[in-house]
Amino acid sequence: MKVDIHARRFKLTEALRHAVHREITRLVQGVGAGITRVSVRLFDVNGLRGGPDKGCLVHAQFTDGSSIVGSDVDDDLYRSVPVAFEKVLRSRRMDRARRHTLRRHHPGAWPNPA
Protein backbone atom coordinates (compact mmCIF):
# COMPACT_ATOMS: atom_id res chain seq x y z
CA MET A 1 0.00 0.00 0.00
CA LYS A 2 1.30 3.43 -0.94
CA VAL A 3 0.80 6.25 1.54
CA ASP A 4 1.11 9.89 0.53
CA ILE A 5 0.80 12.65 3.15
CA HIS A 6 1.10 16.35 2.31
CA ALA A 7 0.54 19.47 4.37
CA ARG A 8 -0.41 22.66 2.54
CA ARG A 9 0.43 26.09 3.93
CA PHE A 10 2.10 24.71 7.07
CA LYS A 11 4.84 22.34 8.17
CA LEU A 12 3.85 18.73 8.79
CA THR A 13 4.82 17.92 12.37
CA GLU A 14 5.76 14.48 13.62
CA ALA A 15 2.67 14.48 15.86
CA LEU A 16 0.37 15.11 12.87
CA ARG A 17 2.15 12.43 10.84
CA HIS A 18 1.65 10.01 13.75
CA ALA A 19 -2.07 10.93 13.99
CA VAL A 20 -2.51 10.25 10.26
CA HIS A 21 -0.68 6.91 10.44
CA ARG A 22 -2.83 5.88 13.41
CA GLU A 23 -5.97 6.57 11.35
CA ILE A 24 -4.55 4.70 8.35
CA THR A 25 -4.04 1.69 10.63
CA ARG A 26 -7.66 1.96 11.83
CA LEU A 27 -8.85 2.19 8.21
CA VAL A 28 -6.92 -0.94 7.20
CA GLN A 29 -8.25 -2.82 10.22
CA GLY A 30 -11.79 -1.64 9.46
CA VAL A 31 -11.93 -2.61 5.79
CA GLY A 32 -9.43 -5.45 5.72
CA ALA A 33 -7.01 -6.03 2.89
CA GLY A 34 -7.58 -4.39 -0.43
CA ILE A 35 -6.32 -0.84 -0.05
CA THR A 36 -3.74 0.02 -2.69
CA ARG A 37 -3.16 3.71 -1.98
CA VAL A 38 -4.06 6.35 0.60
CA SER A 39 -3.46 10.03 -0.12
CA VAL A 40 -3.91 12.52 2.70
CA ARG A 41 -3.95 16.29 2.29
CA LEU A 42 -3.85 18.45 5.39
CA PHE A 43 -4.59 22.12 4.80
CA ASP A 44 -5.07 25.45 6.54
CA VAL A 45 -7.13 27.79 4.39
CA ASN A 46 -6.56 31.04 6.29
CA GLY A 47 -3.05 30.40 7.54
CA LEU A 48 -2.19 32.53 10.56
CA ARG A 49 -5.57 34.30 10.60
CA GLY A 50 -7.14 31.30 12.37
CA GLY A 51 -10.73 30.19 12.36
CA PRO A 52 -12.46 26.89 11.54
CA ASP A 53 -10.44 26.34 8.40
CA LYS A 54 -8.10 23.44 9.08
CA GLY A 55 -8.98 20.38 7.14
CA CYS A 56 -8.13 16.88 6.09
CA LEU A 57 -8.91 15.26 2.75
CA VAL A 58 -8.43 11.49 2.44
CA HIS A 59 -8.48 9.65 -0.90
CA ALA A 60 -8.37 5.85 -0.61
CA GLN A 61 -8.03 3.56 -3.64
CA PHE A 62 -8.93 -0.12 -3.48
CA THR A 63 -7.91 -3.26 -5.38
CA ASP A 64 -11.41 -3.59 -6.87
CA GLY A 65 -10.85 -0.30 -8.73
CA SER A 66 -13.07 1.83 -6.52
CA SER A 67 -11.93 4.92 -4.69
CA ILE A 68 -13.47 6.90 -1.86
CA VAL A 69 -12.83 10.46 -0.73
CA GLY A 70 -13.62 11.78 2.73
CA SER A 71 -12.95 15.25 4.08
CA ASP A 72 -13.59 17.40 7.11
CA VAL A 73 -12.89 20.99 8.14
CA ASP A 74 -12.64 22.09 11.77
CA ASP A 75 -10.80 24.61 13.90
CA ASP A 76 -8.63 21.75 15.22
CA LEU A 77 -6.76 19.58 12.73
CA TYR A 78 -6.44 16.76 15.27
CA ARG A 79 -10.25 16.49 15.29
CA SER A 80 -10.51 16.82 11.52
CA VAL A 81 -8.20 13.88 10.71
CA PRO A 82 -10.20 11.08 12.41
CA VAL A 83 -13.51 12.47 11.12
CA ALA A 84 -12.27 12.41 7.50
CA PHE A 85 -10.99 8.84 7.89
CA GLU A 86 -14.25 7.76 9.54
CA LYS A 87 -16.15 9.08 6.51
CA VAL A 88 -14.00 6.94 4.20
CA LEU A 89 -14.48 3.88 6.41
CA ARG A 90 -18.25 4.38 6.64
CA SER A 91 -18.53 4.89 2.87
CA ARG A 92 -16.52 1.74 2.16
CA ARG A 93 -18.70 -0.32 4.48
CA MET A 94 -21.88 1.02 2.86
CA ASP A 95 -20.46 0.35 -0.61
CA ARG A 96 -19.58 -3.23 0.28
CA ALA A 97 -23.01 -3.82 1.85
CA ARG A 98 -24.68 -2.42 -1.26
CA ARG A 99 -22.63 -4.70 -3.52
CA HIS A 100 -23.38 -7.70 -1.31
CA THR A 101 -27.12 -6.98 -1.44
CA LEU A 102 -27.06 -6.58 -5.22
CA ARG A 103 -25.17 -9.86 -5.70
CA ARG A 104 -27.57 -11.67 -3.38
CA HIS A 105 -30.77 -10.36 -4.99
CA HIS A 106 -29.56 -9.98 -8.58
CA PRO A 107 -26.78 -12.47 -9.39
CA GLY A 108 -24.61 -11.14 -12.18
CA ALA A 109 -25.80 -7.55 -11.74
CA TRP A 110 -22.57 -6.45 -10.09
CA PRO A 111 -19.06 -7.66 -10.92
CA ASN A 112 -17.32 -9.64 -8.20
CA PRO A 113 -14.60 -7.63 -6.42
CA ALA A 114 -11.06 -8.64 -7.27
What are these model-derived regions, one by one?
Residues 1-114:
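N-terminal, polar/charged subdomain of small-to-medium soluble alpha/beta proteins
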